[in-house]
């Protein structure tokens, strides 16, 4: 608002009458209240500002004594109070709990240009419990933040709970170490179980295949893993000895001065009997290998007893009739 000279303001303003003129004379220096607007004048001001009684507004004789400037003053104060009541204080949960700040902005508009007093307006009734309610919310949220689990943030944010002393002091089934969560333990346990199961299946499959290669008198005889290994070693040693005997007989038949009895037998590798049939007859229950396989394993079963070479060479002619006849296989 631009300022005007006193002479121009005097010409443009309407003349004050009655109580308005008296109140204008008692206004502060160089200020006149007209419709709630202060204007400059050259009149002198009284020593003290007037005190307006609130009860004079509703009195029966509220004529010239209570009208005019007093009514405008009361209207201005009512507007300021209504504006302060419309302001709703907001509660911010992100701030730490503390005493509620004093409503400083609400008291600023209470100062009027024509009056030296200040009116202290109290906040609305709903704003009073805002402070305790905020403190209650923070008191409830502090135990949740102190749990220190992976759902509330990184464990480094709570260094006082990273130690295992809390778990040792109050052990319970729902507490755990923060450094090693349940997800890591479950994954490790599943991986270990699957790896052990796969290894056991491979071992069982290998023993089953080895059991099929070992001949026994009842073909479906139940054998333990230890028995399967012992019989497999005996069977391998017997086959190696049989091959050595066949090679020796072949070399002796090729010599010119060979015994005719041994040559007539034809029990070498060059005979008419296939090697597969010979091996089956050797592993029959009547043979020495079959009886040793069905019998109990002795401590010295891992080593073969040394036998003379002529005994080994005479093994095959004795087995030939059993192969040609109807001997068991």
From Swiss-Prot:
GO terms for MF: chromatin binding; DNA binding; DNA-binding transcription factor activity, RNA polymerase II-specific; E-box binding; histone deacetylase binding; protein dimerization activity; RNA polymerase II cis-regulatory region sequence-specific DNA binding; RNA polymerase II-specific DNA-binding transcription factor binding
Subcellular location: Nucleus
Gly residues bias: start-end ranges: 58-70, 263-273
Keyword Disulfide bond: no
Posttranslational mods: Phosphorylated on serine residues. Phosphorylation of Ser-122 by MAPK is strongly stimulated by hypoxia.
Gene3D superfamilies for this protein: Helix-loop-helix DNA-binding domain (4.10.280.10)
Region feature Disordered, mapped onto this chain: 1-28, 40-78, 91-125, 247-329
Summary of the tissues where the protein is detected: Erythroid and myeloid cells.
bHLH domain boundaries: 187-239
Entries under Pfam families matching the protein: HLH (PF00010)
Keyword line: Chromosomal rearrangement, Developmental protein, Differentiation, DNA-binding, Nucleus, Phosphoprotein, Proto-oncogene, Transcription, Transcription regulation, Ubl conjugation
Top-level taxonomic group: Eukaryota
Gene Ontology biological-process entries: angiogenesis; astrocyte fate commitment; basophil differentiation; cell fate commitment; central nervous system neuron differentiation; definitive hemopoiesis; embryonic hemopoiesis; erythrocyte differentiation
Cellular component GO terms held in the UniProt record: chromatin; nucleoplasm; nucleus; protein-containing complex; transcription regulator complex
Low complexity bias spans: 317-329
Residue numbers carrying Phosphoserine: 12, 122, 172
Ranges of biased composition (kind: Pro residues): 96-106
Protein role: Implicated in the genesis of hemopoietic malignancies. It may play an important role in hemopoietic differentiation. Serves as a positive regulator of erythroid differentiation.
Subunit composition and interactions: Efficient DNA binding requires dimerization with another bHLH protein. Forms heterodimers with TCF3. Binds to the LIM domain containing protein LMO2 and to DRG1. Can assemble in a complex with LDB1 and LMO2. Component of a TAL-1 complex composed at least of CBFA2T3, LDB1, TAL1 and TCF3. Interacts with SBNO2; this interaction inhibits TAL1 occupancy of the DCSTAMP promoter, leading to the activation of the DCSTAMP promoter by the transcription factor MITF.
Alphabetical list of PANTHER family matching this protein: T-CELL ACUTE LYMPHOCYTIC LEUKEMIA PROTEIN 1, T-CELL ACUTE LYMPHOCYTIC LEUKEMIA/STEM CELL LEUKEMIA-RELATED
Notes on the domains: The helix-loop-helix domain is necessary and sufficient for the interaction with DRG1.
Stated name of the protein: T-cell acute lymphocytic leukemia protein 1 homolog
Gene (name only): Tal1
């Amino acid at each position: 608002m631009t300022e005007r000279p006193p002479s121009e303001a005097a010409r443009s303003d309407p003349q004050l009458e009655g109580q308005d003129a008296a109140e204008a004379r008692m206004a502060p220096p160089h200020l006149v209240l007209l419709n709630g607007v202060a204007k400059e004048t050259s009149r002198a001001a009284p020593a003290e500002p007037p005190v307006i009684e609130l009860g004079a507004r509703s009195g029966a004789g509220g004529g010239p004594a209570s009208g005019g400037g007093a009514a405008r003053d009361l209207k201005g104060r009512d507007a300021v109070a209504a504006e302060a009541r419309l302001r709703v204080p907001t509660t911010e949960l992100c701030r730490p709990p503390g005493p509620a700040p004093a409503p400083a902005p609400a008291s600023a508009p209470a100062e009027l240009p024509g009056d030296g007093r200040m009116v202290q307006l109290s906040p609305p009734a709903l704003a009073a419990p805002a402070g305790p309610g905020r403190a209650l919310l923070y008191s409830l949220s502090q135990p949740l933040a102190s749990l220190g689990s992976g759902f509330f943030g990184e464990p480094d944010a709570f260094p006082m709970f990273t130690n295992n002393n809390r778990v040792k002091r109050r052990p319970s089934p729902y507490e755990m170490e923060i450094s090693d969560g349940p997800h890591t333990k479950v994954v490790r346990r599943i991986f270990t179980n699957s790896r052990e199961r796969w290894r056991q299946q491979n071992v069982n499959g290998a023993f089953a295949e080895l059991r099929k290669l070992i001949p026994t008198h009842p073909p479906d005889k139940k054998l333990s893993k230890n028995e399967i290994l012992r019989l497999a070693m005996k069977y391998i040693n017997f086959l190696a000895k049989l091959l050595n005997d066949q090679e020796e007989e072949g070399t002796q038949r090729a010599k010119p001065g060979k015994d005719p009895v041994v040559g007539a037998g034809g029990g070498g590798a060059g005979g008419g009997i296939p090697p597969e049939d010979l091996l089956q007859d050797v592993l029959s229950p009547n043979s020495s290998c079959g009886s040793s396989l069905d019998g109990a394993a002795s401590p010295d079963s891992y080593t073969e007893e040394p036998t003379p070479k002529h005994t080994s060479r005479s093994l095959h002619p004795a087995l030939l009739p059993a192969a040609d006849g109807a001997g068991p296989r």
